Amino acid sequence: MSYFFNPEARVEHLEHVAYYESRQSGLGARYLAAFDAAMVKVCEAPHRYGVEFPPDIRRYRVPGFPYNILYRQVGADIEVLVIAPHRRRPGYWLGRL
Protein backbone atom coordinates (compact mmCIF):
# COMPACT_ATOMS: atom_id res chain seq x y z
CA MET A 1 0.00 0.00 0.00
CA SER A 2 1.25 3.50 -0.78
CA TYR A 3 0.15 7.00 0.20
CA PHE A 4 -0.43 10.36 -1.40
CA PHE A 5 -1.01 13.84 -0.02
CA ASN A 6 -4.03 16.07 -0.28
CA PRO A 7 -2.49 19.17 -1.97
CA GLU A 8 -2.91 21.34 1.15
CA ALA A 9 -1.41 18.61 3.32
CA ARG A 10 1.66 18.49 1.07
CA VAL A 11 2.15 22.24 1.55
CA GLU A 12 1.81 21.89 5.33
CA HIS A 13 4.22 18.97 5.37
CA LEU A 14 6.89 20.95 3.53
CA GLU A 15 6.31 23.92 5.84
CA HIS A 16 6.90 21.67 8.86
CA VAL A 17 10.17 20.42 7.35
CA ALA A 18 11.34 23.98 6.64
CA TYR A 19 10.35 25.17 10.12
CA TYR A 20 12.30 22.44 11.91
CA GLU A 21 15.32 22.84 9.66
CA SER A 22 15.32 26.60 10.36
CA ARG A 23 15.38 25.88 14.10
CA GLN A 24 18.28 23.45 13.99
CA SER A 25 20.28 21.90 11.18
CA GLY A 26 19.20 18.28 10.73
CA LEU A 27 15.95 18.63 12.67
CA GLY A 28 13.95 18.81 9.43
CA ALA A 29 15.49 15.49 8.41
CA ARG A 30 14.54 13.99 11.79
CA TYR A 31 10.96 15.15 11.29
CA LEU A 32 10.94 13.56 7.81
CA ALA A 33 12.29 10.29 9.20
CA ALA A 34 9.62 10.25 11.93
CA PHE A 35 6.90 11.03 9.39
CA ASP A 36 8.15 8.32 7.01
CA ALA A 37 8.27 5.75 9.84
CA ALA A 38 4.72 6.70 10.82
CA MET A 39 3.48 6.27 7.27
CA VAL A 40 5.10 2.84 7.00
CA LYS A 41 3.03 1.76 10.01
CA VAL A 42 -0.13 3.36 8.64
CA CYS A 43 0.32 1.70 5.24
CA GLU A 44 0.97 -1.70 6.84
CA ALA A 45 -2.27 -1.65 8.83
CA PRO A 46 -4.42 1.42 8.13
CA HIS A 47 -7.43 0.15 10.08
CA ARG A 48 -5.40 -0.45 13.24
CA TYR A 49 -5.61 3.21 14.27
CA GLY A 50 -8.63 4.95 15.69
CA VAL A 51 -11.34 6.74 13.76
CA GLU A 52 -11.07 10.44 14.57
CA PHE A 53 -13.90 11.67 12.33
CA PRO A 54 -16.54 9.15 11.24
CA PRO A 55 -16.96 7.33 9.06
CA ASP A 56 -13.39 6.77 7.85
CA ILE A 57 -10.87 9.44 8.86
CA ARG A 58 -8.21 7.98 11.12
CA ARG A 59 -5.40 9.46 13.20
CA TYR A 60 -1.79 8.50 13.85
CA ARG A 61 0.60 10.56 15.96
CA VAL A 62 4.01 11.44 14.52
CA PRO A 63 6.44 10.06 17.12
CA GLY A 64 8.62 12.72 18.71
CA PHE A 65 6.80 15.66 17.10
CA PRO A 66 3.58 17.48 18.03
CA TYR A 67 1.56 16.40 14.99
CA ASN A 68 -1.22 13.99 14.14
CA ILE A 69 -1.51 12.51 10.67
CA LEU A 70 -5.15 12.33 9.65
CA TYR A 71 -5.77 10.00 6.75
CA ARG A 72 -8.27 7.79 5.01
CA GLN A 73 -8.04 4.79 2.76
CA VAL A 74 -8.92 5.50 -0.87
CA GLY A 75 -9.03 2.27 -2.82
CA ALA A 76 -5.69 0.57 -2.31
CA ASP A 77 -3.94 3.76 -1.18
CA ILE A 78 -3.84 6.10 1.81
CA GLU A 79 -4.71 9.78 1.40
CA VAL A 80 -2.94 12.03 3.90
CA LEU A 81 -5.50 14.75 4.60
CA VAL A 82 -3.56 16.81 7.11
CA ILE A 83 -0.54 16.77 9.38
CA ALA A 84 -2.28 18.63 12.19
CA PRO A 85 -0.41 20.41 14.99
CA HIS A 86 -1.63 19.32 18.42
CA ARG A 87 -2.26 22.95 19.41
CA ARG A 88 -4.43 23.82 16.46
CA ARG A 89 -8.24 23.72 16.62
CA PRO A 90 -9.44 20.17 15.86
CA GLY A 91 -11.16 19.86 12.50
CA TYR A 92 -9.78 23.12 11.06
CA TRP A 93 -9.04 21.22 7.87
CA LEU A 94 -12.47 19.63 7.32
CA GLY A 95 -13.16 22.01 4.44
CA ARG A 96 -10.64 20.00 2.40
CA LEU A 97 -13.00 17.07 2.08
Regions found by a protein language model. Give the residues of each.
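N-terminal processing/targeting junctions
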Residues: 11-13, 41, 73
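Arg/Lys-rich, positively charged N-terminal/basic patches that mediate binding to nucleic acids
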Residues: 1-32
